[in-house]
Amino acid sequence: MVPLKISTLESQLQPLVKLVATETPGALVAYARGLSSADRSRLYRLLRSLEQAIPKLSSAVVSATTLAARGL
């Protein structure tokens, strides 16, 4: 397991989460067009990785919620 500093992770991912949650697909494409080719590739790889991880994240949220409810 990779050790994570949660506060750093949250602050780094929050702008991406807000961008994806609030923008239309067309706006995201327009945003990506304004990036350098290298950054567009990085963004694409990151979004693909997140897309594959979302199902696992969903079950992790359920587990974390259960642990929090139990006070663990």
Curated annotation (Swiss-Prot):
Its main location: virion. GO terms for cellular component: membrane; viral envelope; virion membrane. It is found in: Virion membrane. The keyword Membrane applies. Keywords: Membrane, Viral envelope protein, Virion. This is Protein P13.
